Amino acid sequence: GVILQYPFYAGIFGILNYSGLGAILIHAFVSITNPRFYTVVVFIFSGLLNMIVPSGGSQFIVEAPYIMPAAADMGVSLTYVLNAFTIGDLSTNLIQPFWAIPVLAAFKIRFKNIFPYCIIAFITSFIIICLYFLLWMY
């Protein structure tokens, strides 16, 4: 799995950076949002990207080249953007099984048995985090 996984992430990084898609994403981020809502957009986008690139470091390599310049263009603090990225990455770990594989194997439990609880925790945390970014970040 790992032998295929990291070259796949490098391929995503290469496509984004060398095809011009990264520049298009920077302009898209700047055009669809404003400084007030940018952290929420980064939070949601990081969560979605986490489903494709579950490794936090690899995800940062793929995502940072366009979320950071877009933040700089809008004048949003990079501290807020990095927090939104990290929390977006971590929050969607609740609904993908990679983190739970060792625990599930140790206790001989299937992911479908804990998934409903993970969904409840994810939805609750998603709402609270979005409200935090919208109400208290500025």
Label each region the model flagged.
Residues 3, 44, 48, 123, ...:
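Generic alpha-helical transmembrane segments of integral inner-membrane proteins
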Residues 92-138:
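Juxtamembrane and boundary regions of transmembrane helices in multi-pass small-molecule transporters
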Residues 4, 8, 83-87, 115-123:
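Internal alpha-helical transmembrane segments of multi-pass membrane proteins, especially GPCRs
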Residues 4-16, 30-69, 74:
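Hydrophobic alpha-helical transmembrane segments of multi-pass integral membrane proteins
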Residues 14-26, 52, 132-138:
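Transmembrane helix-loop junctions in multi-pass membrane proteins
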Residues 24-27, 57-70, 98-110:
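Re-entrant/interfacial helical elements at transmembrane boundaries that shape
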Residues 28-29, 33-37, 86-93:
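Structural signature of hydrophobic alpha-helical transmembrane segments
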